[in-house]
Amino acid sequence: MACKAYRELAFENGIKTPEIVAPQSAHAAFDKAASYFGMKIIRVPLNKMMEVDVRAMRRAISRNTAMLVCSAPQFPHGVIDPIPEVAKLAVKYKIPLHVDACLGGFLIVFMEKAGYPLEQPFDFRVKGVTSISADTHKYGYAPKGSSVVLYSDKKYRRYQFFVATDWQGGIYASPTIAGSRPGGISAACWASLMYFGENGYVEATKQIIKTTRFLKSELENIKGIFVFGNPQLSVIALGSRDFDIYRLFNLMNAKGWNLNQLQFPPSLHFCITLVHTRKRVAIQFLKDIRESVTQIMKNPRAKTTGMGAIYGMAQATVDRNLVAELSSVFLDSLFSTDTVTQGSQMNGSPKPR
């Protein structure tokens, strides 16, 4: 919704082709928003710490720039972008700055009270930050379907509204894309917030960050793998200079761990939640990681198999249109109503003779 709001503001300011300037690591939802709202997204490279390169972001700004984006943290590596530095660009060039805190929003606000103050501010205390998003269904522990967008000034919020005054059915006004919204989700979200309360969120944050810091310090000492950047919250991304990291995914998956496979560069990440703060869970995770890495390092150049190989192949495919087409075919299959009958293929068509 922030993208829609800033597009309308850009139109008002005479920009005909609004652009979103975002880090390479910013969520794909910004690509989705650009596609939906007829905007162009400019992706900015990262530095060695997996933070957005501020100089590169400065060079990416043009007269068509409608908004800047930072993440707190970004999804792939759990790293927070240098928001105060980017905010200076926002102020200098009078461009709105959106902070995507969808993943960590309900952690970062409680970090200081939990005894883990952040290295830099991220919110409206930073001059230039005009909006922040935070998903209540993640570390807010509310049901899926609820999220929050905050604006530094209500003048920005008005741009996300849609109003049709001449419809025969009457005046139609909607604050979001969804025309009708279920009250049950909002009520369940409110109930979750009331159940945990500030003290509950502070305690949850304390346990999660404590566990994450412990895991990070231990993982950094395992030969054969490394941690990307300086993750301050709950996501740790791993890479390797010695072997195909997707082999580690295969072995950990076989041990019951659900890690996310990442690309460009090849990596894995692990998102720590309250479940992982339970007794001996972190210890078991480290034990399994060490055993898996030791096994791989006996033959580091061995070929990757299974799902790891498939993901690696998808990343290496030069024709990204082919990858997109295969993804669309998969999504299409989820909505298929075709049934398999004798003598037919999966899509219902006759088998060739």
Please report, for each region that a protein language model flagged, where it lies by residue.
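Conserved PLP-anchoring active-site segment centered on the Schiff-base-forming lysine
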Residues: 9-28
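Active-site C-terminal subdomain of aminotransferase-like
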Residues: 110-234, 238-243
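Active-site pre-lysine segment of PLP-dependent enzymes
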Residues: 54-56, 80-92, 104-131
